[in-house]
């Protein structure tokens, strides 16, 4: 008897550390359970013509910024390098189905798993992109479940309720990453919704250690900062801490204004992200604690704002 063939629907087109690591962790856990699994490629969900148009204007804006602001050059250089590292990680560590013809999926898969991350975010920034049957497995009548799917909001917009309810009407199992998400989905669908942990917490530390490799042998001691928000207090705090203990300050490149604030602006993909945490004397972050709880333990210390 062959193993059940499963497909995961999540984000892999957004080069975000947490997004890609949750996709990796969930797939590894599914494979551990004995199922076959591929992540469906969502890179070309946006209409090709629209995507090409967007890319053109984005590049024009980037070149203008490079000319007007020299500090942006370092940020942009790191961004390009980081993107390459993300692509390498996705290629090397994720099993991806790059087929874009939805009609062929049911011939390949027996069951669909949707999640995690903010795959069902109804906010104005995301809704236009996410309001497609693809992100709800609406193209199939086969069994579908959600795992740790997040809404990213505290209340669901009334104007989208009917469609959201229809999208989830035939799900066999629903779960969410946050308590508020469980309540919202349960109220809308009338179904039981289970509160589950982020996929990164499904893997024990040994799995992450195997991925990261041995602890670095470098004797360099440094403070590592990973901030999702633009907060002057956070920045001043870590700079003062590094200065007080005579440590270099390394920061990930994700916020442009930090380009000149660190001793080293780090370009990283998911693997390098973990390795830098592993080698840090202390990690400062404002990332939700659950998202990187099992990962941040590799740092000798961690401080969450």
What are these regions (language model features)?
Residues 23, 30-31, 185, 274-279:
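Hydrophobic alpha-helical packing residues
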Residues 143-153, 185, 227-229, 233-269:
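Catalytic donor nucleotide-activated moiety binding site of glycosyltransferases and closely related
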Residues 39-41, 146-148, 172-179, 249-253, ...:
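Short internal beta-strands
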